[in-house]
UniProtKB/Swiss-Prot annotation:
Superkingdom per UniProt: Bacteria
PANTHER family, per database record: ISOCHORISMATASE HYDROLASE, PEROXYUREIDOACRYLATE/UREIDOACRYLATE AMIDOHYDROLASE-RELATED
Family that this chain belongs to: Belongs to the isochorismatase family.
EC number(s) given by UniProt: 3.-.-.-
GO molecular function: hydrolase activity
Name the UniProt record assigns to this protein: Uncharacterized isochorismatase family protein YddQ
Keyword Glycoprotein: no
Keyword Disulfide bond in annotation: no
Protein keywords: Hydrolase
Length: 180
């Protein structure tokens, strides 16, 4: 079974001084870089996903800005595929599924940002497209959320979404556990 790494939205706007800084993006990016190194060393396929905002739907990832660029810690090599998306689901209106099929990919190892948006939406869609998924949770990051007067800390958001994916949609692991 061909396994590919899917690195989602590890982009400058999610880091300190970016327009949508997350909680601990550096730690997630560092772990994603370890996964990237592993996949490159084994010659397995690597796919990067880059979100570019269209219109005024979000205040970050605007075209032709430094914030939209893929972070230097996981910058794609020339031979690696970059999928551009405009919605949280990396399969929606993109050629991701076709590119994965061209490579014979059946299983995805997913990492990136944000846990509660693009990671969640993409993993659920991947399963609907017939892929087996693993999510490397400490190579993902998110942010604190609010609903009415309730504040939900980023750590709680992250683990709630990882727990929701674990089992039916994915096997959720740490970087260390995956690399063993």
């Amino acid at each position: 079974m061909t396994t590919a790494l899917l690195v989602i939205d590890i982009q400058n706007d999610y880091f300190p001084n970016g327009k949508m800084a997350l909680t601990n993006p550096e730690k997630a990016a560092q772990n994603a870089a370890k996964l990237l190194s592993h996949f490159r060393n084994t010659g397995a396929p690597v796919f990067h996903v880059q979100h570019i905002t269209e219109g005024n739907i979000a205040h970050f990832f605007h075209p032709n800005t430094e914030g939209v660029e893929i972070h230097e810690s996981v910058r794609p090599l020339e031979k690696e595929t970059v999928i551009v998306k405009h919605m949280p689901n990396s399969f929606f209106n993109t050629d991701l599924n076709g590119k994965l099929q061209e490579e014979g990919v059946k299983e995805l190892v997913v990492c990136g940002m944000m846990s509660h948006m693009c990671i969640d939406a993409t993993v659920r869609s991947a399963v609907e497209h017939g892929y087996v998924c693993q999510v490397v949770e400490d190579a993902c990051a998110t942010t604190t959320l609010q609903i009415e007067d309730k504040i939900v800390p980023a750590e709680h958001v992250h683990y709630a979404f990882m727990a929701a994916l674990n089992g039916v949609y994915a096997t959720v692991k740490t970087t260390e556990a995956f690399l063993k």
